[in-house]
């Protein structure tokens, strides 16, 4: 018998959904406790040179320079174009081979740490959850997500345990991922679906219907049946879900 603290974060969110800090002269913005991450695409020389050429030919380099000169990019350091390019809001880094890497945002990790350490003083056990649809670079696909967890989620899970969490529980991709015992404490990278009510939604927005050329006479049941191809694709057809 004891007290359990349950806390959580999400790495899958729209930017406007993220909670924002307040100031003495401005209230904080309510929102989700976000776990941001840095995504880097490592590319070989030929691809990198083509990106540079495309940036200039399409005018994106001029737009970036104008934004920096106008001050809209804040005090960010100038990136060396000889090794790093930001193209269509994606970061590309010159390397020896192609690859993708991710790392957790340190400010968000520090925020996690503060509240985990506080919870350990008020509870007997601390459970930390993370909603994460992103995936790693290996393993088979189920839907648009791979079996492997992303690097930044592994980093965050280890960090949470190091700060005092007794258990880290991931969810989001709708299927089971691996389990790790880290410092004698369990990490579940995805618990899958204990209860999945994807097909029991009562209302759908108009654009959802229009995506499948459905009109005003159709119901949510019609939409869901059309989306799943009559149960032949997506969640309904893959037993892993």
Stretches found by the model and what they are:
Residues 1-241:
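Acidic, metal/ion-coordinating pockets
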